[in-house]
């Protein structure tokens, strides 16, 4: 009996590509304040694995959860949604 496991995916913007085979992705989410009801934007920076160093700053990517690859890295970049515009 094999079970299918749902893989968590998030979408975010690459804010750093200075590390080898790793990018930092800023993931924003909107939550409602429990007391006042105002919609607040919260952000989280996640390190994700980029095997070929192909993603750059400003790219919008989809990351998916995987096994731990290092102390701080347990996500892998799965697809490119939008390439950053070059100036």
From Swiss-Prot:
HAMAP family associated with the record: Ribosomal_uS17_B
Role description: One of the primary rRNA binding proteins, it binds specifically to the 5'-end of 16S ribosomal RNA.
UniProt family annotation: Belongs to the universal ribosomal protein uS17 family.
Full protein name: Small ribosomal subunit protein uS17
Family annotation (PROSITE patterns): RIBOSOMAL_S17
InterPro entries: NA-bd_OB-fold (IPR012340), Ribosomal_uS17 (IPR000266), Ribosomal_uS17_bact/chlr (IPR019984), Ribosomal_uS17_CS (IPR019979)
CDD domains per record: Ribosomal_uS17 (cd00364)
GO BP: translation
Any one GO cellular component localisation term in the record: cytosolic small ribosomal subunit
């Amino acid at each position: 009996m094999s079970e299918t496991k749902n893989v968590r995916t998030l979408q975010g913007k690459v804010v750093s590509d200075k590390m080898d085979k790793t990018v930092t992705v800023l993931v924003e989410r909107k939550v409602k304040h429990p007391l006042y009801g105002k919609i607040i934007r919260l952000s989280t920076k996640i390190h994700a694995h980029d095997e070929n160093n192909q993603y750059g700053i400003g790219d919008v990517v989809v990351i998916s959860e995987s096994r731990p690859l290092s102390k701080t890295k347990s996500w892998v970049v799965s697809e490119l949604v939008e390439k950053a515009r070059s100036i």
